Amino acid sequence: MKCLLISLALWLGTVGTRGTEPELSETQRRSLQVALEEFHKHPPVQLAFQEIGVDRAEEVLFSAGTFVRLEFKLQQTNCPKKDWKKPECTIKPNGRRRKCLACIKMDPKGKILGRIVHCPILKQGPQDPQELQCIKIAQAGEDPHGYFLPGQFAFSRALRTK
């Protein structure tokens, strides 16, 4: 029993926190790249940031395409933002951290139908207005009359009394 516990502890030490991250599909990886490109376009960003972990990744198929929602963390590097893709950019140990929410919708051919990327400084966290924007992105390109909710038309006509 003791050997089993020791080997389990050693295995957990080698896996670390990276082992708990979700495995990303090809669509999710592409969405992460789109989100990083979008993040590095913003003028207030001076230095490049690198992705240090994906906390959550969801993918939903709609009739107009695929909706991807990602929650991930970024940390500041020593490179200017124009060089963010270069492999020699190293993470600054005390660099700023950001927690990002990205919602991206792609059609079946891979064309971007809509996107939002919100990356506040880590201590803030995602807020409700971003959740509403995320829902709007998920519905991009969908037919608003293509589906109905149960009971949606149950009381659409007033009862007539005789």
UniProtKB/Swiss-Prot annotation:
Transmembrane segments: none annotated. GO terms for molecular function: signaling receptor binding. Residues 157-162 form a propeptide. Secreted in an inactive precursor form, prochemerin, which is proteolytically processed by a variety of extracellular proteases to generate forms with differing levels of bioactivity. For example, the removal of six amino acids results in chemerin-156, which exhibits the highest activity, while removal of seven amino acids results in chemerin-155 which has slightly less activity. Some proteases are able to cleave at more than one site and chemerin forms may be sequentially processed by different enzymes to modulate activity levels. One of its GO terms (biological process) is positive regulation of fat cell differentiation. InterPro entries: Chemerin, Cystatin_sf. Keywords: Chemotaxis, Differentiation, Disulfide bond, Inflammatory response, Secreted, Signal. Residues 1-20 form the signal peptide. It comes from the Eukaryota. Gene3D superfamilies: 3.10.450.10. It is found in: Secreted. Disulfide bonds join C79-C89, C100-C119, C103-C134. Expressed in the differentiated adipocytes (at protein level). Abundantly expressed in the liver, adipose tissue including visceral, epididymal, and brown adipose tissue. One of its GO terms (cellular component) is extracellular region. Induction: Strongly induced during adipocyte differentiation. Adipocyte-secreted protein (adipokine) that regulates adipogenesis, metabolism and inflammation through activation of the chemokine-like receptor 1 (CMKLR1). Also acts as a ligand for CMKLR2. Can also bind to C-C chemokine receptor-like 2 (CCRL2), but with a lower affinity than it does to CMKLR1 or CMKLR2. Positively regulates adipocyte differentiation, modulates the expression of adipocyte genes involved in lipid and glucose metabolism and might play a role in angiogenesis, a process essential for the expansion of white adipose tissue. This is Retinoic acid receptor responder protein 2.
